[in-house]
Amino acid sequence: MMSIDITTNHKIIFGDARKMDEIEDESVHLVVTSPPYPMIEMWDELFKMLNLEINKRWMEMENEEDEEKKEKLIMQIYNLMHQTLYPVWEEVYRVLVPGGIACINIGDATRKINGVFRLFPNHSKIIENFEKIGFVTLPYILWKKPSNKPNAFLGSGFLPPNAYVTLDVEYILIFRKGKPRKFKPKDPLRYASAYTKEERDRWFSQIWEIVGDKQTHPKIERRTASFPEEIPRRLIRMFSIIGDTVLDPFLGTGTTVKAAIELKRNSIGYEIDKSLKPIIEEKIGIKQKRIGMDFNVEFINRG
């Protein structure tokens, strides 16, 4: 990869990504994000806050005695959670350039509600919604998280038939806005962004084995659900060139912005939780002198 001197700009907005008024149409080249996972317990309260109808149906479900009606309410809640994310995906389509790529890290959910254990296939719901908006679905990546822990098999242990398969992969879904992006012949920034044969062979295989990131941070006593830096680093190298703009509408602790800075891409991040600001500042090294990196960071607080 050739060395290119470039000053990059990074904008971190504390606000709801369902309206990204700060971003112009067709001005983003790549989206890398991991949204809240519907029907994963740690995200229940956030979804209830973002969509009061979810809170209402949840209370109805807990008070309902008829099993058939409970079942319907559970599926209504699941669908409402995905409907809550849908405006973000519409905004992603609006801001992407023609040929721009969106990479969505999502896991399916397993959960026992009202005594019934079930799978909630989040990845298929995301694909359905992206295609409804107009995206082209590309082959996805399976992120397998290696673990030294013995598998926590669910169900009846060694006795068939009532045990359940353990979910040990997440999906990195890949979508494109329209036809492939076009470049000028011998574009210097594109050539400077090239990866090696070894990188290509490893990155473009469907299964990635990457150790998951810590889910807690010492400065806040709760889970942050951040993905490991290796994931946005690979995706940014694979699907953008130096000088491009990368968007993460669910920024969390700032992993995508950090990777964008180090890979000489511009970036924009949205985060609804303002308390994460000091963690983001620490992660991206805003108070540190970074050798060989020239970048500007702007924080915006919506009123």
UniProtKB/Swiss-Prot annotation:
It catalyses: a 2'-deoxycytidine in DNA + S-adenosyl-L-methionine = an N(4)-methyl-2'-deoxycytidine in DNA + S-adenosyl-L-homocysteine + H(+). One of its GO terms (biological process) is methylation. GO terms for molecular function: DNA binding; methyltransferase activity; N-methyltransferase activity; site-specific DNA-methyltransferase (cytosine-N4-specific) activity. InterPro entries: DNA_methylase_N4/N6, MeTrfase_CN4_CS, RM_Methyltransferase, SAM-dependent_MTases_sf. It holds the Pfam family N6_N4_Mtase. Its EC number is 2.1.1.113. Keywords: DNA-binding, Methyltransferase, Restriction system, S-adenosyl-L-methionine, Transferase. The keyword S-adenosyl-L-methionine applies. GO terms for cellular component: cytoplasm. It comes from the Archaea. It is an enzyme of class 2 (transferase). Belongs to the N(4)/N(6)-methyltransferase family. N(4) subfamily. This is Type II methyltransferase M.MjaI.
